[in-house]
Amino acid sequence: MSPSKWLLTYERAVKKATKVKLAAPKYKHVEIILEATTEDPETLENVIQALCERLKEQSWTIVFKTLIVFHVMLKEGAPNTTIVALSQRPRILEVLKASSLLAQGKNIYNYSRFLSERAKQYGRLGVDYAQVGDAPKKKIREMKLENGLLRNVEGIQAQLRRLIKCQFVAEEIDNDIAITAFRLLVGDLLVLFKAVNIGVINVLEHYFEMGHHDAAQSLRIYKTFVNQTEDIINYLSTARSLEFVTKFPVPNIKHAPISLTASLEEYLNDPDFEENRKQYLQNKSGSPVEETAILNRKPTLRKKKSIPKKQNESSSTIQKENTVQQEASSSEEEAVKSLPETQRTTSRIETQEEEIKEEEMEGEEEEEEEEVPNYESENELEDKVGDLSLSLGVASSFVDEMLRERNNLSAEGTSASPSLDKKSESTNIVQPIPSHPNDSLNPFYNSSSPTYHPQPIPPQLQQVQLLSQMAGNQMANIQYTMNGMQQTGASPNTALNISQVNMYAQNNPVNPSTTNPFQNFLRQPSYQGMQFEQQQPTTIPLQPNIPVLNQQYPVMIPAMEDSRGPLPSPAHIMYPEGSPGFIQHSPNGFTHGHSASPVNIGQKLDVPERPMSTPYTASKNPFSTRELAEPTDLARNSISTESKNPFRS
């Protein structure tokens, strides 16, 4: 492609990127302009010249978008290309006619001054500290005082001074152009502030090495840093409040200490400034006074070297003691040789016995040392067993709470829950087992057990537990009785089977069946002062439900009269023996809370047969005001053929 065509594409991209439209420059046009930064300097110069022509327009949108394109070229273009070209003539970025722009005029002016200052400081320092990367920060961190440390820090502060003045008001950031410019400025602010932090720390490290003039300049730099830090914090707080608009996360910044101004001024204004500086340099580099002191410390080193001599002396004394012991032992042997043979043998025997005792003592000590680990292992085993039992106790308590909440049982009426390893320790009480094995709430219940063998129960314990269950578990779905297998009518030597359970078997009158839906409506009698006897169970084959009672049970039937006389009292009704009922006969004649006469078994009553045509004795008309006639009159009127019209005379 010829250069003319290249120029045409770049000029077209510049015009498209800086249109009058109130919108941010499209990246597809900016991308073409960024390609010019990788071309030869002439192409880049032509693009810059075309952008400068757009800065002379009267529309603030065109001018603002042109500055944004310049900023993007400095940030995302080829490094050290656009900044080099602008540093040669930095004033071309300044918008002189910004005051004539009614809208966004102040923001455009400050924005252009910042870009111009950035290009100017690059031409002065040779480093673009606003460029993203670690190279500029590394350079200022390792820079020394004689290499222009103070000058570089002042250049960074000059850029920050111009940037802080670009304070966009929140009401002015109401369009995409201002939002894009503000986002780019916040990014440069964070990069420059990081660079100035590193530079100020480096200045403070060399502060006490400087002369009076450099120290005064460093103090001015530090004061400027303190003031700019406060302004930067306010600027970033505004940016943090506009994160939802700019979509640029603002981090929490850390800066150098800003409370050293007084101490630095005190050091600078000290009349002994030069003496303090020389002393600091001597302490840092090392003075000849210290070298002579180090040479004079040789006797101390000799004293340390004389320590092995003491060790040699101690070793020589030990050798002397050994020689003395050897001489003493040799003298004893000579004395023993001079003794007669009998005394020699006795002395040898004594020495042998002493040696044997010493060996036994040493053996016992070794055994004790070997047994210590065994004791430790036993302690560890006990700890492990204790931990295991604790965990089992926690598990059993959890099961207790689960059963208590599910069955709504009281603490007195429930027994200890089964553990994982041990069975129930009770020998006189049979654990309650539901009539259906699948409905068991016990998680450790073995449903595969073939038989059930109840154990003998003392009558007092049986009745007390029955009463506690009646008081605490009236609405339970499972019959928690002490002799549940026999009360439900199943054989004690057969496995639990639904087909073998008699659902119509007789129950204990003291403990009404918990499956009775009307049991909550029955008033519970007072059991104080009464003695209960053990109930002997009876097994009855499966029979249909016959609503006939074969025991004493309160039946309240109101007295009624018929046309032929009063009806007989229910106390004289004779029920056949052996008929199955819902409540078992109690031998003590216990009544269930009513004052009516009980039903006596064995008494006969002649019940007259009533005709089916007996009229009803009460009128069902709610609007009838006429008094009811006697039953005899009703029967007579039902047979008569007279008219029943009430309006007929």
Curated annotation (Swiss-Prot):
Keywords: Cytoplasm, Phosphoprotein. InterPro entries: ANTH_dom, ANTH_dom_sf, AP180-like, ENTH, ENTH_VHS. This is ENTH domain-containing protein C19F8.03c. It is found in: Cytoplasm. The keyword Flavoprotein does not apply. Residues 280-382, 409-440, 590-649 are annotated as: Disordered. GO terms for cellular component: actin cortical patch; clathrin-coated pit; clathrin-coated vesicle; cytosol. Residues 299-308 have a biased composition (Basic residues). Residues 352-381 have a biased composition (Acidic residues). CDD domains: ANTH_N_YAP180. Coiled coil: none annotated. GO terms for molecular function: 1-phosphatidylinositol binding; cargo adaptor activity; clathrin heavy chain binding; phosphatidylinositol-4,5-bisphosphate binding; SNARE binding. GO terms for biological process: clathrin coat assembly; clathrin-dependent endocytosis; intracellular protein transport; vesicle budding from membrane. Gene3D superfamilies: 1.25.40.90, ANTH domain. Pfam families: ANTH (PF07651). The modification Phosphothreonine is found at T414. Residues 2-136 form the ENTH domain. The modification Phosphoserine is found at S285, S287, S417. Residues 313-326, 340-349, 409-418, 614-624, 635-649 have a biased composition (Polar residues). Signal peptide: none annotated.
